[in-house]
Amino acid sequence: MSIKYPKYPNITIIGAGSYGTAIAIALSRNGHSVLLWGHNAIHIQKLQINRCNQAYLPGIAFPPSLYLEKSLSIALSTCRNLLIAVPSRVFGHVLMRLKPNLKSNTRIIIASKGLEPKTGRLLQDVAYDILGKNIPIAIISGPTFARELAMGLPTAITLASNDTILSCDLQNILHCNKNFRIYSNTDTIGIQIAGVVKNIIAIGAGISDGIGFGSNARTALITRGLVEMSRLGIAIGATLDTFMGLAGLGDLILTCTDNQSRNRRFGILLGQGFEIHHAQKNVGKIIEGFYNIKEVYMLSVKHKVDMPITEQTYQILYQNKNVHDAAHSLLERTQKEEKINGLK
């Protein structure tokens, strides 16, 4: 028997992992009719039967207005607002699958955090390249753990778009006075760079805690990590204000200090002496920072941006550098003046 979906409001979410499911639950609980699609038909069928994502968000029931769909063409057939929440390494592939079925008036909301593998391109640029320059695009990012969002706990994020009319419209659609606050921004570059670099700094902060360096060291890494994030973003065309907001400082603090963060947990295990593959297996889910650090390091070299925490973390992950040696390399750097305006 086919399911008859409501025509409005029209939000389709691509990606039935923890974050995509959490957003779907939050939006449907806040009064929207939401369609959730995932690439694994068996997984979607389980969600339909259980009315819960037991694999990622156990114990959190789906609201009645959250619909599940196995067919991509059907999921896109009534879609006006399309929110994409898939890992960055498959983002381009997913867009290629979406393209033949997209309606001409579809607006894209990118919830994925990361860069295109090997090229280091921003996901917004990947979307423009595949779907065309005229498609309306917004990016959402900020301090959001999936489980807290799905539970209805208060959450605030940033929505960025070059199109201020689109930004205002989507802000009104997604915002909920009860528990989901949306701030608008026009710096799409900054919001994307922040969402990538914060995962790398979280791995570094986790390594520090795993070694046992304590709160002083963690706070220093967060603060200097914010400088690295800002340096890279500004070199690419972002504005400093973005990194002082929810998508920058907010998400950085959350990811570096709370053990719900996969990247932080991964770093802690490395600091405790676990081999990389054992730490990955222990965390059990995709660790975006592990993959994206290659592209971030590549961008830092390309744009001649000094990112010592990123560099040392990269050497730990991909050049077999000992975690203690990496820590000493950071501490032994030449002394310098701290000047935030100049991002020294």
UniProtKB/Swiss-Prot annotation:
NADPH binds at S18, Y19, H39, K113, A146, R262, I286, E288. One of its GO terms (cellular component) is cytosol. InterPro entries: 6-PGluconate_DH-like_C_sf, 6PGD_dom2, G3P_DH_NAD-dep, G3P_DH_NAD-dep_C, G3P_DH_NAD-dep_N, NAD(P)-bd_dom_sf. Its EC number is 1.1.1.94. Keywords: Cytoplasm, Lipid biosynthesis, Lipid metabolism, NAD, NADP, Nucleotide-binding, Oxidoreductase, Phospholipid biosynthesis, Phospholipid metabolism. It is an enzyme of class 1 (oxidoreductase). Belongs to the NAD-dependent glycerol-3-phosphate dehydrogenase family. This is Glycerol-3-phosphate dehydrogenase [NAD(P)+]. HAMAP family: NAD_Glyc3P_dehydrog. The keyword Chaperone does not apply. GO terms for molecular function: glycerol-3-phosphate dehydrogenase [NAD(P)+] activity; NAD binding. Pathway: Membrane lipid metabolism; glycerophospholipid metabolism. It comes from Blochmanniella pennsylvanica (strain BPEN). It is found in: Cytoplasm.
